[in-house]
């Protein structure tokens, strides 16, 4: 095999492997049958930020900030401050679950519910030792639950149910708290950039009718 043929073969191999990794990443973020039957839809396609935006700007974003990227089927936050990542769509009553893991021990982020277009209010804290605290809004019953979180490098599953003014929060399949008094009726979902690297995937949501 001459050098030109060898280089072409290597290029084809690299392309095939890249496509394989992308396909595997997309499959890893697919909904299970149980999730589909329950009415969940995926908020993340495992490839890009379709359905999301930064600081209330265009969706999908034309330019990515330095601290957010999609890689290996994951949303990766390298740290830094703004911009936060927000949904392109507003939600009223919903159930959402997602998985996150800390890359380092000293992590900090947050999960926004019914927030403004530039997400920043109504945050369930995701800062080490303060996970679960409610910031930027007033509800009664929320509390810090660091004891329910796993150590850095392991995946945590958070689940949040928002119906009317009530918010119910689970960590790793354990009920963390139930709170009432959420004032905003509708808003955006988001993830906070707060100076620490984290990774997210398996973002699922189902919208609920008021009667649910």
Residue ranges and their predicted role:
Residues 12-24:
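Bacterial N-terminal signal peptides
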């Amino acid at each position: 095999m001459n050098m030109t043929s060898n280089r072409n073969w290597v290029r084809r191999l690299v392309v095939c492997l890249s496509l394989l990794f992308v396909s595997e990443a997309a499959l890893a973020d697919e909904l299970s049958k149980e999730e589909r039957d329950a009415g969940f839809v995926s908020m993340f396609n495992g490839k890009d930020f379709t359905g999301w935006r930064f600081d209330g700007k265009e969706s999908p974003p034309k330019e990515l900030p330095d601290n957010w990227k999609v890689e290996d089927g994951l949303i990766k936050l390298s740290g830094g401050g703004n911009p936060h990542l927000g949904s392109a769509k507003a939600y009223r009553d919903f159930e959402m679950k997602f998985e996150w893991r800390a890359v380092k021990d000293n992590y900090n982020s947050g999960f926004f519910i019914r927030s403004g277009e530039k997400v920043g209010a109504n945050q369930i804290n995701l800062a080490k030792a303060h996970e679960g605290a409610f910031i930027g809004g007033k509800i009664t019953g929320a509390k810090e639950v660091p004891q329910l979180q796993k150590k850095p490098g392991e995946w945590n599953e958070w689940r949040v149910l928002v119906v009317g003014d009530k918010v119910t929060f689970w960590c790793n399949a354990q009920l963390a708290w139930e709170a009432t008094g959420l004032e905003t009726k509708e808003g955006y979902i988001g993830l906070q950039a707060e100076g620490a690297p984290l990774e997210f995937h398996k973002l699922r949501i189902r919208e609920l009718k008021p009667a649910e």
